[in-house]
Amino acid sequence: MSSKEQKTPEGQAPEEIIMDQHEEIEAVEPEASAEQVDPRDEKIANLEAQLAEAQTRERDGILRVKAEMENLRRRTELDIEKAHKFALEKFINELLPVIDSLDRALEVADKANPDMSAMVEGIELTLKSMLDVVRKFGVEVIAETNVPLDPNVHQAIAMVESDDVAPGNVLGIMQKGYTLNGRTIRAAMVTVAKAKA
């Protein structure tokens, strides 16, 4: 038998087997190449995704730090502004008893006595000068009557029946109150009107 005539156990010539195997390989190869992804491409895609995520985190971090710095700057400016505005608070609190003493001296002074008129005038001028000076620095006196009771600036000491003043309004001032740049440094002690029973 010649080599062409040799048959394989299945009854096929060796050339036919080679051809069949070659066709099977060709048929399998396109499927394998479609399924087979280059691991480098996958790694590149993964690294690009990680890079994009890192850049986003970095951008967010920078924005957050900028926002925190801006907030810190604003808070610092407000703190400095408050420190300037209210730096005199302790000093003004020390002056209030002096102003109260001058007020009481005027209340008890015998203004009808001609011998005391010079002293009364001196006390009035001293009190006026002192109040003018503290007003320049933002201090205001709380001494109005017949205004609604405001717990932010008034401290009610007593309630008194009154026909002249509406109920709930300030009837009288026992001790003047003071504000410094709108902040109450001492509430006015007041009597409050109530309706007659």
Curated annotation (Swiss-Prot):
GO molecular function: adenyl-nucleotide exchange factor activity; protein homodimerization activity; protein-folding chaperone binding; unfolded protein binding
Gene3D superfamilies reported for this sequence: 3.90.20.20, Head domain of nucleotide exchange factor GrpE
Region described as Disordered: spans on this chain: 1-39
Keywords: Chaperone, Cytoplasm, Stress response
InterPro entries (UniProt xref): GrpE, GrpE_coiled_coil, GrpE_head
Gene Ontology terms: biological process: protein folding
CDD domains: GrpE (cd00446)
Localization annotation: Cytoplasm
Gene Ontology CC terms, in alphabetical order: cytosol
Similarity comment text for this entry: Belongs to the GrpE family.
Biological function: Participates actively in the response to hyperosmotic and heat shock by preventing the aggregation of stress-denatured proteins, in association with DnaK and GrpE. It is the nucleotide exchange factor for DnaK and may function as a thermosensor. Unfolded proteins bind initially to DnaJ; upon interaction with the DnaJ-bound protein, DnaK hydrolyzes its bound ATP, resulting in the formation of a stable complex. GrpE releases ADP from DnaK; ATP binding to DnaK triggers the release of the substrate protein, thus completing the reaction cycle.
Subunit details: Homodimer.
Name of protein: Protein GrpE
